[in-house]
């Protein structure tokens, strides 16, 4: 595709070449930010992460992001070695070092640390965790609605790699994205184990039908913070919203479709599997929810 669009698409910003990055308690220039080739995150994708957005000097829903990070770390038996408060302070310290006040995105990554030998067993990670905070100027730039293609790949299952783990290991999602791109789309629409519409490779997925907002049950997708905020906004503003099973047939005939995620908030979908969704442009419900969300985060 020559006109590829991504849910994480942002304006080019030359300032990002000179950002300061937090690495294990030290703030260093981008060119000097490094981790060991023996790091368990590099070798095996053994770690968890969070993405957090800065709007007008405030990190949106930072407490919920910290809760999710620490819950995921506990689930994989990874001791972060810091409190939630100290991790938040590291985020604020990195923000100050970069002089950022708005339209910034932070990726906070924690791995099991440096291994003594290049093999799988977690006991080989004996140095303590590795933590990195990358913070970039990231004003979203979306020239058109997203095009999706349904792919055969699925998110992890609760008994394999639970999708609620924001894991460094994203190979299934990367393969899904590759398949979608080869099908002429921007990103992938992924079904659940029962064949119902679930999520995309990078975001949670919603449709609008006859004034109702639908999203998946949440059983097989990331427990998205922006997803939950949209559900809450619908309920607070008398917009019918349902977490339910629905099929591709339901999806193709939707009036609107949109994605939710920390980076892009609410991203319109214009086409799925070659079918135009609604008018192919951002619909009135998506626009309304974007407005309500902007008020919520103070954007």
What are these regions (language model features)?
Residues 226-228:
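Secondary-structure junction motif
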Residues 1-189, 193-196, 222, 231-299:
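Conserved alpha/beta cores of soluble small-molecule-handling proteins
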Residues 189, 196-218, 223:
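Glycine- and Gly-Pro-enriched alpha-helical subdomains that act as flexible
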């Amino acid at each position: 595709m020559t006109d590829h669009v991504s849910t994480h698409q942002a304006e080019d910003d030359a300032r990002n070449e000179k950002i300061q990055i937090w690495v294990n308690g030290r703030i260093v220039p981008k060119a000097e930010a490094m981790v060991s080739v023996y790091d368990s995150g590099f070798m095996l994708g053994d770690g968890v992460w969070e993405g957090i957005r800065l709007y007008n000097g405030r990190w949106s829903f930072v407490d919920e992001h910290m809760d999710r990070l620490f819950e995921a770390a506990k689930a994989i038996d990874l001791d972060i070695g810091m409190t939630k408060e100290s991790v938040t302070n590291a985020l604020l310290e990195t923000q100050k070092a970069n002089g950022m006040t708005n339209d910034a995105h932070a990726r906070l990554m924690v791995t099991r640390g440096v291994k003594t030998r290049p093999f799988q067993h977690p006991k080989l990670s004996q140095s303590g965790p590795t933590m990195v905070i990358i913070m970039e100027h990231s004003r979203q730039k979306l020239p058109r609605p997203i095009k999706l293609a349904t792919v055969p790949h699925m998110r992890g299952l609760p008994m394999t790699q639970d999708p609620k783990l924001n894991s460094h290991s994203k190979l299934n999602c990367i393969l899904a994205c590759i398949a979608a791109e080869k099908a002429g789309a921007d990103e992938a629409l992924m079904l659940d184990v029962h064949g119902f519409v679930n999520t995309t490779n990078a975001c949670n997925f919603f449709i609008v039908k006859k004034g109702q907002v639908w999203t998946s049950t949440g059983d097989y997708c990331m427990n998205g913070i922006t997803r939950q905020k949209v559900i809450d906004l619908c309920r607070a503003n008398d917009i019918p919203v349902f977490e339910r099973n629905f099929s591709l047939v339901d999806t193709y005939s939707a009036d609107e479709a949109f994605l939710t995620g920390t980076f892009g908030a609410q991203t319109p979908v214009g086409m799925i599997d070659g079918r135009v969704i609604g008018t192919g442009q951002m619909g009135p419900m998506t626009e309304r929810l974007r407005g309500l969300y902007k008020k919520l985060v103070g954007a």
